[in-house]
Regions:
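Nuclease-adjacent, charged terminal/linker segments that flank catalytic cores
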Residues: 1-3, 9-10
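Catalytic "initiation/cleavage/transfer" segments centered on a nucleophilic residue
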Residues: 11, 15-48, 56-73, 119-171
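Short, conserved, surface-exposed binding loops centered on an aromatic residue
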Residues: 40, 90-92, 105-108
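Residues at beta-strand starts and edge strands
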Residues: 43-47, 94-96, 109-113
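Surface-exposed, low-hydrophobicity interaction/linker segments
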Residues: 66-101
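Histidine-centered divalent-metal-coordination microenvironment in nucleic-acid enzymes
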Residues: 98-121
């Protein structure tokens, strides 16, 4: 075993060698309020962004999948961070705080992503807004306009969770 598995196994063996007794494992299902509180603690967030995606890519003749959803969301946050922080982002020293939610829905609904993005105090709001729009124009799977608004409160996170917590991705 290598990497994290080795450390996890080693930690488990150490715990067992100290005669720790685990009575039973309980599967806990958190409430919506607990999940919203957890997501809110990942902030602070300054921007609420929604972007529509294509159901089918016109050139590659492929339909959107959850993997493409996630890659598109991560790519967008990465482009915005690269534009704002340049080398600091490339070397892992600075990035925007962000979470996003994938919403696919039925055949009649357009797939889209919802973002909650936090920014640093050192950055001007105009500069961040410019990079949010600029990164959107470089995206491959997007369709239509982007909707960018100031993040108001955790009500946006409640809206995130309407399709379930499994659709939320941290960046």
């Amino acid at each position: 075993m290598y990497g994290k598995n080795r450390t996890l196994t080693h930690g488990l063996l150490v715990a067992l060698s100290h005669h720790l007794k685990i009575k039973r494992l309980v599967k806990v299902k958190p409430s919506i309020n607990e999940i919203v509180r957890f997501l809110d603690n990942q902030g602070p967030f300054d921007w609420a962004v929604t972007m529509n995606l294509k159901k089918r890519h016109p050139f590659y003749q492929t339909y959107i999948t959850p993997q493409i959803f996630e890659q598109t969301g991560r790519h967008y946050l990465s482009l915005v961070s690269k534009g704002l922080f340049k080398r600091q982002y490339r070397y892992g020293r600075a990035k925007l705080n962000g979470i996003f939610c994938m919403e696919l829905g039925g055949l009649e609904k357009r797939p889209h992503l919802h973002f909650a993005i936090g920014s640093h105090d050192k950055l001007h709001k105009y500069e961040i807004l410019r990079h949010l729009n600029k990164a959107y124009k470089k995206m491959d799977w997007v369709k239509g306009d982007i909707h960018i608004a100031p993040y108001q409160d955790s009500g946006w996170l409640n809206y995130f969770l309407k399709t379930g917590f499994s659709s939320v991705v941290f960046h």
